[in-house]
Amino acid sequence: MFWALLFTFLLTQRKKMDFTLRTYRKLLVALLHKGYRFITFEQYCMLLPSQRRERFVILRHDVDLKAENSLRIAQIENELGICASYYFRIVPDSNKPEVIRAIAELGHEIGYHYEDMSIMQGDVDKAYTHFQEQLAYFRQFYPVRTICMHGAPTS
């Protein structure tokens, strides 16, 4: 049902893909009007199996580049009463402490978008140490409980 709704919504957007914030807001509002509840990945992990039958959207953002754009998205979600999961990398385009802090203060989940094996060129021991250090870094902004791998082949 969700995918059918999303597909129909996208088709009505002037027959072209429209990735503007205005259209994103419209999509969120359409899902809210259809009775979907938005939850973070952390919230999903805490659901009982019986609760997983409800209509919900796990809203997750991988912040690979342009962290400032993620803040604008987080503000829109906050205005609509929606919480999402934001996964940040440690690279300069993603790792903007002021943005991470602002998104966390809006009530969104913060997670670590890790790529430690790639950064440490396959050295497992160094990657493990690096992972622990970076996780501690992100935990200064939010009590990180979920992580997701970046798409690098050796992450």
For the regions a protein language model found, what residue spans apply to each?
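Catalytic alpha-helical scaffold of carbohydrate-active enzymes acting on polysaccharides/glycoconjugates
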Residues: 2-155
